[in-house]
Amino acid sequence: MGYLISLGIYSFKGVKVGLDCANGSSWNIAKSVFDALGADTYVINAQPNGLNINLNAGSTHIEGLQKFVVENHLDVGFAYDGDADRCLCVDEKGNVVTGDHILYIYGCYMKERGKLLTNTVVTTVMSNFGLYKAFDEKALATPRRLWATSTSMSIWPRTAAASAVSRAVTSSSASTPVPATAS
């Protein structure tokens, strides 16, 4: 946390942020991060007892945060899942901004500032194909899980890493998925 704050490139000064910690692992850190970045931070579901993790809370029950943000006139809200490895966002009107949307917005932001190494954004296996198409339109590469079929080869970004993996897969007789790795 200290490193991100020390960069001085992110400021939430004057932004009213709602957090739903799902009574999970983010309960004691999420507020501290946003407070340190200058946000006016409001938190729900930050009282874990070992039994209530994700219980009608967090990213799997986003409706609680939607209502909280709208009723308290907040600018934005973030809902984490119990172990805080997933996050959804809610705008000031209660509209949900999905993880793919967050990744797209931040990927474009980082590209515009020249902060992406090789203009590549890493996605999850759960990312929607629409995200890949949107990144393609912005000339952003995404290392993806490659399936050993000729059809899947056509959707890969044309990068040196993708070409190397493509050659390796097509020259083998493997019929199992081969994960791509960035070098």
Question: Model-derived features: where do they sit?
Answer:
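Short, high-confidence coil segments that cap the C-terminus of an alpha-helix
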Residues: 72-74, 160-161
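Short, glycine/acidic-enriched loop or turn micro-motifs at the edges of active sites
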Residues: 23, 82-86, 94, 169
